[in-house]
Amino acid sequence: AVDMTYAAFDYAQQDRNPVLILSDGVMGTIMEPVELPPERSAEEVRALKEQCRSWAAIGHDSYKEPRATIDAGRWDTKEQERHCKKAEELYKSWPSEAETLYLDDAEVVVTGYGICGRIARSAVKLLRAEGCKVGLIRPKTLYPFPSDVFAGLDFVRVKAILDVEMCIPAQVVDDIRLAVTDRCPIETCLHAGGEIMGRDEVRSEERRVGKEC
């Protein structure tokens, strides 16, 4: 979470586009030791400021150069369409990110985002210690969604995917279905309304899914 928050500012400045940090309530309240990225030098900070001098409203001599403007759209429809195509190319350039574990021999793949991703990772490591052939996909970006990671699974071996979410009804399961395209069953392990997911629940659901598939 710390690394992604740090990177969000770079992405926002690079593309002049808002970046949403989708932290959940648990991630926003826990305390734990973290390792911060290296501090940038004064020269690096000056270079970053200089990059945005031509377009940002920095408060000094901004009247001397045209600044970025925001409007509802363009009256010329062809120009608006060109702008939309340019934006599409920008969106395609954004990398998707996901943490993966033990996918080389997994028969059941557990997935979760936010705090559920961390809980799922802990459960998967315990299950592996018990001899279960289980893997993990933990999406770090939800847009773009790491569809290629799900689509690239070996569906001859993978019997099912278990989606862990603190959300009822599940939301990310729809993105998973689009990536998997009915090549294996997708089960859910859900909580909502303030109920916190536990790793023992995830372990129990994984065992159930593994037996049924």
Tell where the protein language model's regions lie, with residue ranges.
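Conserved thiamine diphosphate
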Residues: 1-25, 198
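Short acidic, glycine/serine/threonine-rich loops at helix termini
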Residues: 4-6, 30-37, 41, 173-175, ...
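Buried hydrophobic positions in well-ordered alpha/beta secondary-structure cores of metabolic enzymes
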Residues: 6-8, 110, 138, 162, ...
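Short, solvent-exposed amphipathic alpha-helical segments in soluble enzyme
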Residues: 6-11, 36-39, 122-130, 151-155, ...
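Conformationally flexible catalytic loops at phosphate/diphosphate-handling active centers
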Residues: 16-100
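Glycine-rich beta-alpha junction loops
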Residues: 23-30, 114-116, 168, 193-194
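Redox- and metal-dependent alpha/beta enzyme cores, enriched for Fe-S-associated oxidoreductases
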Residues: 100-132, 137, 143-149
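Peripheral docking tails and interdomain loops at the edges
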Residues: 164-211
